[in-house]
Amino acid sequence: MTIALGKFTKDEKDLFDIMDDWLRRDRFVFVGWSGLLLFPCAYFALGGWFTGTTFVTSWYTHGLASSYLEGCNFLTAAVSTPANSLAHSLLLLWGPEAQGDFTRWCQLGGLWAFVALHGALALIGFMLRQFELARSVQLRPYNAIAFSGPIAVFVSVFLIYPLGQSGWFFAPSFGVAAIFRFILFFQGFHNWTLNPFHMMGVAGVLGAALLCAIHGATVENTLFEDGDGANTFRAFNPTQAEETYSMVTANRFWSQIFGVAFSNKRWLHFFMLFVPVTGLWMSALGVVGLALNLRAYDFVSQEIRAAEDPEFETFYTKNILLNEGIRAWMAAQDQPHENLIFPEEVLPRGNAL
């Protein structure tokens, strides 16, 4: 018996090969297999958001006006979450809630579920697009890995957090002022600013901004004067083989400033990747914790002493009182279906009052 080893070649292309050739063809806008997920989902998510902010009211879900048609502007318009009574319903247009009635579906908050789902899939499609292109041109996949940070934050905030609560109602609505309201809600009900995962997220994002500013300024400061152009952009050939700036000079400069400096470009750029992505992932993990109602840092001894001693108060105890005020105000305003009424004597008062 003879076994022949070799590369198998097909005589003619099948449907998959034809599709692969067309999708991955070199064109102005790359499509790829990832584009089958990215482009339709991005189109539907953006289209749903523009439709909702232009025409759809939030009167039936939040008791609010939220569209341009009702007088809102870009900062106050939003696609609002479904009512709390709908819990975690997928709110399909053909489902038992809307029963195929598009107007009723919009009034119930179906557009929010539509935008959230397609938005998440579009972000995942964009990450897969970066994977696919990187593989095609034989690059490492670090762009896609970095983009996992924003995806983790989006999925944790818009999907996982409300899944841990009583319904989609407690997710952020898709609008600028609506997300500001959600941030205040997070602070009042979860003391989010004192959560260690939020602290790591802030350190990551602001640290990344600092690293970008330092890196950009350092590169500009140490450019080689190779060209005759009057500015940076005309001085160099985009296909040049030589270095654009002096890493050695930059290293000497920061060694004198801080006493330490990055010794090579690989470590420097990996650190610039690591800091923001880790910060975003930590924030996402923190939000998953909030979905389970895990608490932030509590300094109970300070709260007890502040309650017993009228002259003792810290910034922490003042913030706790502020959180109580946010809860007392937002619970009644934000959940009108609960008919909550708080008499004045139960509202929080600081020792200074």
From Swiss-Prot:
Chlorophyll a ChlzD2 binds at residue 118. It is found in: Plastid, Chloroplast thylakoid membrane. Gene3D superfamilies: Photosystem II protein D1-like. Its EC number is 1.10.3.9. It is a multi-pass membrane protein. Its main location: plastid. Keywords: Acetylation, Chlorophyll, Chloroplast, Chromophore, Electron transport, Iron, Magnesium, Membrane, Metal-binding, Oxidoreductase, Phosphoprotein, Photosynthesis, Photosystem II, Plastid, Thylakoid, Transmembrane, Transmembrane helix, Transport. 2 of the reaction center chlorophylls (ChlD1 and ChlD2) are entirely coordinated by water. Belongs to the reaction center PufL/M/PsbA/D family. This is Photosystem II D2 protein. It comes from Lobularia maritima (Sweet alyssum). The gene is psbD.
